[in-house]
Each structure stands twice: as C-alpha cells, then as structure tokens.
C-alpha cells in the first residue's frame, strides 16, 4: 500500500464520518424543534388551565348572583316602585342567565383548547423522543 492509497482511504472514511455527523446534527435540530413545540404547547395548556380556573370562578360568582336575584330583598310600598323593582330584577335575572350561558360556552371552548394543546404537546414530545 503506498501513500496515495492510504490518503484516498482516509479521505473516504473522513467523508463518511462527515456525512454521518451532518445527518446526526440534522436529526438533533429536528428533534430540538419538536421539543420546543412541545414546550410551547405545554405552556399554552398551563395558561389555558389558569384561564379556565378564572372562568369557573366567574361562573360561581354569576351563579351566586342569580341565586341572590331570585330572593325578594326589597319591600317597597306602593304599586309603581314595586313594578319598577320587579321589572329591573327580571331584567337582571335575564342578563345573568345570558351571561351564565356565555360563560358555559367559553368554558367548553377553553376545555377543548386545553385538551388539544395537551394532545399536541404529547405528539411533539413523542416525535422528539422517537
């Protein structure tokens, strides 16, 4: 074996190693991207959990307000003030009902979004690990 043969063999092996290293670097880059996405979805899921807790707290407050609105706490003598009070109370009950329905819809949307974010986080984490 002369020097040229050895040099050719070493260069060939170096090219193989270099190509393999580039493939590994690319794979690391791809998996790192998946991990970043998984982390972002986990953060989103956490933030949605906080928002969901806030919505549930608001729903409880609205439910308490609706219960309070059903109680007659004012006794006004005379027909006109009572009529005005009853109309305003009924309007308030109606608005609280609408608000309660909107809160329930928002709660459902947040729960769905949280579930999707959790699924995506798991999906990207699994892609990064496989």
UniProtKB/Swiss-Prot annotation:
**Where does this protein reside within or beyond the cell?**
Secreted
Alphabetical keyword list: Secreted, Virulence
The secretion signal range is none
Please give the start and end residues of each transmembrane region: none
Any GO CC annotation of this UniProt entry: extracellular region
Secreted among keywords:
yes
Superkingdom to which the source organism belongs = Bacteria
Principal localisation: secreted
The keyword Secreted belongs to this UniProt entry's keyword annotation: yes
The entry's function note states: Implements its pathogenic function during infection.
> Assembly and partners?
Forms both homodimers and heterodimers with EsxA. Homodimerization is calcium-dependent.
What is stated as this protein's family in its record?
A: Belongs to the EsxC family.
Task: Tell me what this protein is called.
Answer: Type VII secretion system extracellular protein C
Q: Which organism is it from?
A: Staphylococcus aureus (strain Mu50 / ATCC 700699)
What would be the name of the gene that encodes this protein?
A: esxC
């Amino acid at each position: 074996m002369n020097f040229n043969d050895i040099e050719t063999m070493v260069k060939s092996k170096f090219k193989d190693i270099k190509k393999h290293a580039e493939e590994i670097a690319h794979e690391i880059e791809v998996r790192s991207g998946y991990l970043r996405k998984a982390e972002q979805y986990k953060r989103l899921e956490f933030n949605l959990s906080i928002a969901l807790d806030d919505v549930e707290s608001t729903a409880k407050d609205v439910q308490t307000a609706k219960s309070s609105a059903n109680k007659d706490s004012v006794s006004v003598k005379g027909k006109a003030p009572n009529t005005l009070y009853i109309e305003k109370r009924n309007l308030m009950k109606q608005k609280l009902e609408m608000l309660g329905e909107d809160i329930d819809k928002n709660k459902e949307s947040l729960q769905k979004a949280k579930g999707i974010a959790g699924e995506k986080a798991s999906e990207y984490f699994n892609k990064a690990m496989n």
